[in-house]
Amino acid sequence: METVRDRSGTRYLLVKRSAESSRVRDPRTGEERYVRNDDLEPSDESALLAAGRATPTAVREDPDLRGVGDERTLGLLREIARREPVGVLTLLDSYDLCESDLHGSLAELRAAGLIEPADLDGITLADDRGYRTTERTRAAFDATRQDG
């Protein structure tokens, strides 16, 4: 996944590019919309870093999530929450992490009790390992959605 900017400088995550327009997602709100390609330019920021930086303060300050080590890992947690259950191969294909960095971040999130293994039967390849967020992680993200 790439990041792009519109003419006003607002950053988006590029979901899908077509011939004349692209579907983009606002990393703060998760809202998706189409924007003309002529109105977008590439951004050099990592998609996971952008997602992490866009995490609401209320989520960052949640006692259960405070232990996340850095913004990129927080972005990974948000993306897992958005796409769950999601396979490791899908994450490797979608984001700018090498296998070693991804597994390190997943191990950190697992050790903190923020993600757990998930069954991917029928979703991806049979030998792909999957993850989903834990109940306490979902509760932290849901609380901010309900607050506005």
Where are these regions (language model features)?
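Short amphipathic alpha-helical elements of helix-turn-helix/winged-helix folds
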Residues: 75-83
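Short amphipathic alpha-helical interaction segments
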Residues: 96-112, 117, 128
